[in-house]
């Protein structure tokens, strides 16, 4: 059960960092890359 909690915490932390970097960059570049 502890392993599941630690995995969830790790994924949550990675998700928060990913969103922070994604939102830090200007949305214009992301939209242009997507098209």
UniProtKB/Swiss-Prot annotation:
Superkingdom of this protein's organism: Eukaryota
One annotated Gene Ontology cellular component of this protein: chloroplast thylakoid membrane
Subcellular location: Plastid, Chloroplast thylakoid membrane
UniProt keyword list: Chloroplast, Membrane, Photosynthesis, Photosystem II, Plastid, Thylakoid, Transmembrane, Transmembrane helix
InterPro entries: PSII_PsbT, PSII_PsbT_sf
One Pfam family cited in the UniProt record for this chain: PsbT
Primary localisation category: plastid
TM region(s), chain numbering: 3-23
GO biological process: photosynthesis
Topology within the bilayer: Single-pass membrane protein
Keyword Ribonucleoprotein listed: no
HAMAP family the record matches: PSII_PsbT
Subunit record text: PSII is composed of 1 copy each of membrane proteins PsbA, PsbB, PsbC, PsbD, PsbE, PsbF, PsbH, PsbI, PsbJ, PsbK, PsbL, PsbM, PsbT, PsbY, PsbZ, Psb30/Ycf12, at least 3 peripheral proteins of the oxygen-evolving complex and a large number of cofactors. It forms dimeric complexes.
Sequence similarity: Belongs to the PsbT family.
Role: Found at the monomer-monomer interface of the photosystem II (PS II) dimer, plays a role in assembly and dimerization of PSII. PSII is a light-driven water plastoquinone oxidoreductase, using light energy to abstract electrons from H(2)O, generating a proton gradient subsequently used for ATP formation.
Name of the protein in question: Photosystem II reaction center protein T
Lineage, uppermost ranks: Eukaryota, Viridiplantae, Streptophyta, Embryophyta, Tracheophyta
Gene that produces this protein: psbT
